[in-house]
Amino acid sequence: MVSICDRVRYVETDMMGVVHHSNYFRWFEMGRVAWLRAAGVELWELMNANIIFPITHVEANYKESALYDDEIEICAEMTAFSRAKMDFTYRIVRKKDGALLAEGCSRNVFTDN
């Protein structure tokens, strides 16, 4: 598992300071890219080799709201890998109290240009 930390920005929230749900998918992507980078995989190298892996499925289960200025931990783990696909799971946790804010998963499939 790879984890990175970030802080909720004002632009990611609504008028009440609650994070808009779409931001969790961006955070999942940040975790996935960090996981790949830690494994020695750079996305631009794959793209230069005409290897692409679009997301064909993504889901999120929201547990508790993230709020403006919360420090969060984004955790990503690869759970399956084959020549055809790779699956990841994610957890978003508020650092100050350890509250699970969201969890999710995604699937990428491999193809070429």
Where does each model-flagged region fall?
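Hydrophobic beta-strand-centered segment that forms part of the acyl-chain substrate-binding groove
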Residues: W35-M86
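Hot-dog-fold acyl-thioester-processing enzymes
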Residues: M1-H57, D112-N113
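A generic structural signal for ordered secondary structure
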Residues: Y10, V58, I74-A76, G104-N108
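Aromatic side chains
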Residues: Y10, H20-F28, Y62, Y68, ...
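HotDog/MaoC-like acyl-thioester-processing domains
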Residues: V2-I4, R37, L67-Y68, M78-N113
